[in-house]
Amino acid sequence: MCGIVGYIGGDQAAPILLHGLSKLEYRGYDSAGIAIRNEETGNISIVKAKGRLKILSEKTNDGKAVQGTCGIGHTRWATHGEPSENNAHPHCTDDKSVVLVHNGIIENYQELKDKLLKSGYTFYSQTDTEIAVKLVDYYYKKTGTPLEAISRAMLRIRGSYAFGIMFHDHPGKIFAARKDSPLIIGKNENGSLIASDVPAILDLTRNVYYIGNHEIAELTQDEIHFYNIDREEIQKEMVEIKWDAEAAEKGGYEHFMLKEIHEQPRAVRDTIGAYVKEGKIDFTETGLTDENLKDLERIYIVACGSAYHVGMVGKYVIEEIADVPVEVDLASEFRYRNPKLVKNSLVVIVSQSGETADSLAALRLAKERGIPVLGVVNVVGSSIARESDYVLYTYAGPEISVATTKAYSTQLIAMYLLAIQAAQVKGVIDDARCEELITEMETLPDKIQKTLDDKERIQWFASKYANAKDVFFIGRGIDYAISLEGSLKMKEISYIHSEAYAAGELKHGTISLIEDGILVVGVATQKDLFEKTISNMVEVKSRGAYLMGLTTYGNYNIEDTADFAVYVPNTEEYFTTSVAIIPLQLMGYYVSVAKGLDVDKPRNLAKSVTVE
């Protein structure tokens, strides 16, 4: 949520900032702005716009109207104060002696504002960010040095933040600082950069530094220096980003989401290949050893959104294959219920970005309780990756569309890998069964591709029901977890009211919502639960529902009940989610397209939720 870009170098800054901000649109925003310093005059120009980034581009003539080689930019997601030009970043002091952009939430903003009001400061916006810039200015006037001003402000602020800061009295410099909000520092031959995420600067450099909590960076065109909160200089290791810049482009597809749906065979294959060597699972890269798994008595999977649905699948798979009890928690609820974490357990944090605020908070609670943490993340060097005891990277590559597809699919692979490895180490399955499961898992990329090849039928069906007012998804066991993700895909990008229910719960109230014309999607891929789910599907059809059935090849008698049937390839039932989710992703996508909506950037949503 929110996006930050900064540049100091030999080129004009404004076009670079606008381009970088365009690469962060997936994070969600309602306004945007840039601040550019003109080296000849020393003046700092600030331009803001409410709405889409193209409005800011038009106001600045694509950046050409604002001259200068040093600047900071921002896309804002409103948290304090309504979406408006006045509340948009960058924010500044009255004389523009300090200019600042911010991602995060300052929890004690009212306390700090009261302090600053007593010191004679006035405020023009409703934002917590304006408090931050004036707090930095307050300490700058006291100390006379940017580093001390920033560090003292950091000590006073409670909450999360990533800052990009310019001082009028210090031309040719940008300062950056962070706590619990993502920020990276980049370097190329022409200058230095800051950004909230890799795609913003990937066209300019692959060489980045990850700035840690309570750390400050000082950037000039030629050099970057890092400091801890005590202003002691520290050393950082440069990291090379391995992503291909083209991977963050649409590549001929109409939307990023469709491209990313079609990239799933590759993403799944890459993730399996990273951990399966010569037919055996190798967790050396994760740091997780056989000894860590051997005495495991319980696993806690903690996540948000689609990653939480992955956790639900993980629960079924791990308990069935490895015979280890699993609890699945929403990260936003986990720490507030005072969880009773047992010894010899493992907390698994699942997050695409590795920066999800609630998941980070859950991770830290687990570590405070002395429970080891396995992070399942897609972004190398992210906060969750750095703070976890063990890290299982997924190899989805950059995922730009707000609605996750390929990251979800690679997270499923992480659950399968963990289940199989734990089962073998604990002696629950023998080598032959382990080999059998791994071999079947390796067929998933081809089976996903086969499912994608049947997308025209889904497109036809989606266009027919694009004007539905309600869509319900039902299933049992793993099929219920699949239904939850299918429903989320439908509601988040098509804006159609959609809910998922455990099919056996229909009689306990939900069936009263069924009436003529309601679309119900019945997911029935589990052999032992097939007849029971069909029975529930008959119940809703008898009350007027139009029924779509989703099952595996061979279960053709579903057509006796369903008005429209979709089939996916057979696989181990533990792995069915990987193929069954594909038609539901496509269905959500094609409904959104039929309605003419912004598929990649749905309203009110952000790709990376970095505030609680």
List where the protein language model places each region.
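Active-site phosphate/pyrophosphate-binding segments
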Residues: 264-268, 272-300, 390-519, 592-612
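Glycine-rich phosphate-binding loops that contact phosphosugars or nucleotide phosphates
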Residues: 294-436, 440-443, 523-569, 587, ...
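Glycine-rich oxoanion-binding loops at beta->alpha junctions
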Residues: 69, 73-86, 277-290, 314-350, ...
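Conserved short alpha-helical segments that host acidic/polar catalytic motifs at enzyme active sites
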Residues: 1-250, 254, 266-297, 336, ...
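Acidic/histidine-rich
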Residues: 157-191, 466-492, 529, 534
